[in-house]
Amino acid sequence: MKYLLSTIIFFISFISFSQDINFGDGEFEVKTNIDAVYTDDGDTYKISSSGDAGDYGKVYLSYKFTSILDTDGQGEFTGFAWAQQGEETQQATLQGVWKKQGNVFILYSLDSVTDGNLMMVSGVLDMVNQTLNFKVSPIQ
């Protein structure tokens, strides 16, 4: 009984010190239209899109979608973003995972921005309607 109680307390202490990712107060939407899609080999796809990114202004995105583990209907991506609002410009590196869900692709990403923000992103890539839209939030 003493051993069982010690084990339970041990595991509870790990849980209580675990880290959480907290969404920031500045959540915003990014709405883009797909400008181009292409592939060189039929396995890796590259997409570019442009649109509006809230306070970041006009945004241009480029993505490289892969499935390194060759899993059906899911994989990973990397990319780059460039945004401008007036004279201010920002850049971001994009990295995340994708999963096909019906006729769209669901994307989850953790991005690093030159203004010092780390962003958590969830989005929908709709190839039929040529849209790529996201909800973005700073990580606290």
Question: What is the predicted function of each stretch?
Answer:
Residues 13-15:
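N-terminal signal peptide c-region/cleavage motif recognized by signal peptidases
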